[in-house]
Amino acid sequence: RGLGDVYKRQIKRSSIILGQLLEAVICTFLEVGIMSIVSLLFSVKPQINLITLLLTLILVFLTAFSMAGLAYGISLILPNEVMYETVMNAIVLPIFFLSNALFPVDGMKGFLAFIINANPFTHVISAIRSLLLYGTIDIANYLFVVSLFVLIASISFGWAFYRLNKEMNL
């Protein structure tokens, strides 16, 4: 048995997907690190301790993993990069603008309030904002957000796995 035997082994498809998703998560953490340094230069004073940092990192990991799975699954059904970029913009921009990322939604009423509250990113943004800006967290809300994103991550991973199997078994 030599090194050549190692290279001849078949890689599990779930490992391929997991590697792709974890790469996206690592890139996300690098981006978050850079943005954190930049925010400190603008005199942002986060309420960070070990617990809030750990809880925030869990939320960032789950969010990045979920979105990476969705993006990977979408990339497997589209014919080229131009279509991928167009579709991702059509998904990401409404999700971003229909969340509480840019404006407060406390007094909002009606259909728009319903849409914003149905957006999972509204909840994860609120949880991260509460952790970093105020150093507090509502445990029930935090567990809801973690459960929601574990579910979304599981579904997106499963869908990406399904799409990869379908793509490779043509």
Predicted regions: what is each one?
Residues 31, 35, 91-100:
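Mobile beta-alpha loop/short-helix "lid" or hinge segments that flank ligand
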Residues 39-40, 44, 76, 100, ...:
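Transmembrane helix-loop junction
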